[in-house]
């Protein structure tokens, strides 16, 4: 049998300990003048729009992951990538790490397998947003607060 704890699962017979792997994902709020980039992923359950997100690959830094995911999913380049915060993410046992980045160039060309829509929005024409408790919504609310000043 297995005995569980918060950190690991231990096999009672052989004593082997198994630590769950953690999947790290990034979330990035891309700013362009007085607008922010919002996308709708095909796997979203609902009609809301959110921020570009993706999983960290072995051997890359979090900042490299941010730049790669934005480029892959939208065709855009970003700069001034800065840490915002993080949130435990229950599925698939992960950690979501949020970043803010500035638009650096390119035209939006969506990765159609992943995204059904994406565009820059000003505070006056925002589409439906993610739920309040999500890291994405906290980041968007922060941007709304900052862009108002």
Model-derived segments and spans:
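Short, small-residue-biased leader/transition segments that mark boundaries at the very start
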Residues: 1-9
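Disulfide-bonded cysteines in secreted/extracellular proteins and peptides
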Residues: 8-14, 65
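N-terminal strand-loop-strand
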Residues: 12-51, 55-56, 77-78, 101-103
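Nudix hydrolase/Nudix homology domain
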Residues: 45-49, 91, 111-149
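The catalytic Nudix box helix
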Residues: 51-85, 99, 107
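Active-site-adjacent beta-strand/loop module that shapes the phosphate/pyrophosphate-binding cleft
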Residues: 87-109
């Amino acid at each position: 049998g297995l005995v569980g704890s918060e950190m690991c699962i231990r096999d009672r017979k052989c004593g082997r300990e198994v630590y769950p792997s953690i999947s790290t994902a990034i979330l990035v709020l891309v700013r362009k003048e007085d607008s922010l980039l919002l996308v709708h992923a095909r796997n979203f359950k609902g009609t809301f729009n959110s921020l570009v997100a993706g999983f960290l690959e072995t051997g890359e830094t979090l900042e490299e992951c941010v730049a790669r995911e934005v480029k892959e999913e939208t065709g855009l380049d970003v700069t001034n990538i800065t840490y915002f915060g993080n949130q435990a993410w229950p599925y698939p046992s992960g950690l979501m790490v949020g970043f803010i980045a500035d638009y650096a160039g390119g035209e939006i060309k969506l990765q159609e397998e992943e995204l059904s829509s994406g565009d820059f929005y000003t505070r006056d024409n925002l589409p439906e947003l993610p739920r309040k408790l999500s890291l994405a919504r906290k980041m968007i609310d922060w941007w709304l607060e900052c862009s108002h000043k």
